[in-house]
Amino acid sequence: MNRIYACPVADVPEGEALRIDTSPVIALFNVGGEFYAINDRCSHGNASMSEGYLEDDATVECPLHAASFCLKTGKALCLPATDPLSTYPVHVEGGDIFIDLPEAQP
């Protein structure tokens, strides 16, 4: 895994999301003080998940076609999406957030 620095904890208030411009682009969410990182692109359409509608049950709804995804597993919960989103481990160290990304393939 390749651990990257994402941002200070204060940059992602509870109930909010932040787009992290890395490769791949990540959507970082704060749900009740727990942080989740998923691929920022909806698996159904070309929409930014960081602009989606965050629910208290750690799900996010795509802003384009209302597909819903579990932030914990990336699983698509309803149509029109059927493919899951990639999820990434998140670590809080002090006041900073780090995300583990897979190693780049040669």
Curated annotation (Swiss-Prot):
Keywords: 2Fe-2S, Aromatic hydrocarbons catabolism, Electron transport, Iron, Iron-sulfur, Metal-binding, Transport
MF terms (GO), sorted A to Z: 2 iron, 2 sulfur cluster binding; 3-phenylpropionate dioxygenase activity; metal ion binding
PROSITE patterns named among the record's database cross-references: RIESKE
Pfam families reported for this sequence: Rieske
Keyword Iron: yes
Disulphide bridges: none
Pathway in which this enzyme or protein is active: Aromatic compound metabolism; 3-phenylpropanoate degradation
Binding-site residues for [2Fe-2S] cluster, renumbered to this chain: 42, 44, 62, 65
Known cofactor(s): [2Fe-2S] cluster
Record note on cofactor: Binds 1 [2Fe-2S] cluster per subunit.
A single BP term in Gene Ontology: 3-phenylpropionate catabolic process
Domain Rieske: 4-99
Subunit structure: This dioxygenase system consists of four proteins: the two subunits of the hydroxylase component (HcaE and HcaF), a ferredoxin (HcaC) and a ferredoxin reductase (HcaD).
Function: Part of the multicomponent 3-phenylpropionate dioxygenase, that converts 3-phenylpropionic acid (PP) and cinnamic acid (CI) into 3-phenylpropionate-dihydrodiol (PP-dihydrodiol) and cinnamic acid-dihydrodiol (CI-dihydrodiol), respectively. This protein seems to be a 2Fe-2S ferredoxin.
Protein family membership: Belongs to the bacterial ring-hydroxylating dioxygenase ferredoxin component family.
UniProt name for this protein: 3-phenylpropionate/cinnamic acid dioxygenase ferredoxin subunit
Gene behind this protein: hcaC
